């Protein structure tokens, strides 16, 4: 081909390319911003780290689901401290007397107690040898000799008193019961020469042996019953047979 023929073709190609670039550049300005370069989307990156927990929200309303079954009861907790005492309540009304089909219970209890006391006294009497009874008195002796104070204590232990004859019959019973001298419940310790019983009463019956009482050596303030049945004053510190009288 002739160089002169190819030159026009070359110019035509340059013009066509220049026109095409001009048109493309104008279209690009219509679709892409002038600052940001247009390109195809990139590949998604990895997820970022979790952010910090936000503030706790308010309690929501119960859901509309079915309520679950009640759980089993828990273990008993430790007992609490005792509470303060309450104020006294109002006084109640007086109740009706209770029924007592067997009689008055208080009377029955009193009789039972009296019977028990009497049985106890009888048991104590058994500790003595068999005694003698006259009228409403029972005279008993344990056969032991001791001072007057010990005789008083012994008789008092058995709810009795030292034997004190108030008449000839009682004096004879005591005489037949003992075979040796026995203390009687008679003294003049308070007032010399004025013999009284242990309750302080003056004697209405006496059976002094001849020449008695003589208060020998000024120390004979107690009285014994002799084997003959007569009375004699002796020192209270001397030892003689113990004999007690019990009311029956």
Curated annotation (Swiss-Prot):
Cystine pairs: 155-244, 222-236
GO biological process, one term: complement activation, classical pathway
Keyword Nucleotide-binding: no
Subunit structure, interactors included: Oligomeric complex of 3 or more homotrimers. Interacts with MASP1 and MASP2. Interacts with MEP1A and MEP1B and may inhibit their catalytic activity.
Protein name: Mannose-binding protein C
GO molecular function: D-mannose binding
Location (main, coarse): secreted
Modified residues (4-hydroxyproline): 47, 73, 79, 82, 88
Coiled coil: 112-130
Compositional bias ranges of the Basic and acidic residues kind: 49-61
Renumbered residue ranges of the record's region Disordered: 36-112
Domain named C-type lectin: residues: 134-245
Subcellular compartments: Secreted
Superkingdom in the source lineage: Eukaryota
Native source species: Saguinus oedipus (Cotton-top tamarin)
Description of post-translational modifications: Hydroxylation on proline residues within the sequence motif, GXPG, is most likely to be 4-hydroxy as this fits the requirement for 4-hydroxylation in vertebrates.
Purpose: Calcium-dependent lectin involved in innate immune defense. Binds mannose, fucose and N-acetylglucosamine on different microorganisms and activates the lectin complement pathway. Binds to late apoptotic cells, as well as to apoptotic blebs and to necrotic cells, but not to early apoptotic cells, facilitating their uptake by macrophages.
Domain notes: The coiled-coil domain mediates trimerization.
A Pfam match: Collagen
First and last residue of the signal peptide: 1-20
Domain Collagen-like residues, every copy: 42-99
Gene Ontology CC terms, in alphabetical order: collagen trimer; extracellular space; multivesicular body
Keywords noted in UniProt: Calcium, Coiled coil, Collagen, Complement activation lectin pathway, Complement pathway, Disulfide bond, Hydroxylation, Immunity, Innate immunity, Lectin, Mannose-binding, Repeat, Secreted, Signal
């Amino acid at each position: 081909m002739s160089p002169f023929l190819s030159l026009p073709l070359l110019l035509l190609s340059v013009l066509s390319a220049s026109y095409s670039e001009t048109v493309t550049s104008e279209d690009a300005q219509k679709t892409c911003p002038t600052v940001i370069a247009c390109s195809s989307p990139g590949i998604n990156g990895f997820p970022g780290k979790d952010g910090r927990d936000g503030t706790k929200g308010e309690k929501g309303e119960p859901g509309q689901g079915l309520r679950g079954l009640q759980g089993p009861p828990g273990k008993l907790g430790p007992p609490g401290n005792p509470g303060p005492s309450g104020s006294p309540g109002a006084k109640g009304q007086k109740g009706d007397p209770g029924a007592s089909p067997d009689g008055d219970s208080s009377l029955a209890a009193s009789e039972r107690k009296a019977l028990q006391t009497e049985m106890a006294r009888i048991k104590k009497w058994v500790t003595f040898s068999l005694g003698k009874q006259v009228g409403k008195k029972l005279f008993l002796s344990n056969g032991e000799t001791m001072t007057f104070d010990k005789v008083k204590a012994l008789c008092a232990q058995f709810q009795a008193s030292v034997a004190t004859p108030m008449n000839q019959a009682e004096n004879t019973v005591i005489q037949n019961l003992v075979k040796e001298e026995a203390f009687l419940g008679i003294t003049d310790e308070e007032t010399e020469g004025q013999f009284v019983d242990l309750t302080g009463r003056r004697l209405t019956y006496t059976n002094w042996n001849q020449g008695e009482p003589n208060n020998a050596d000024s120390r004979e303030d107690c009285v014994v019953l002799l084997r003959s049945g007569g009375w004699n004053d002796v020192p209270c510190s001397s030892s003689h047979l113990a004999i007690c009288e019990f009311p029956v």
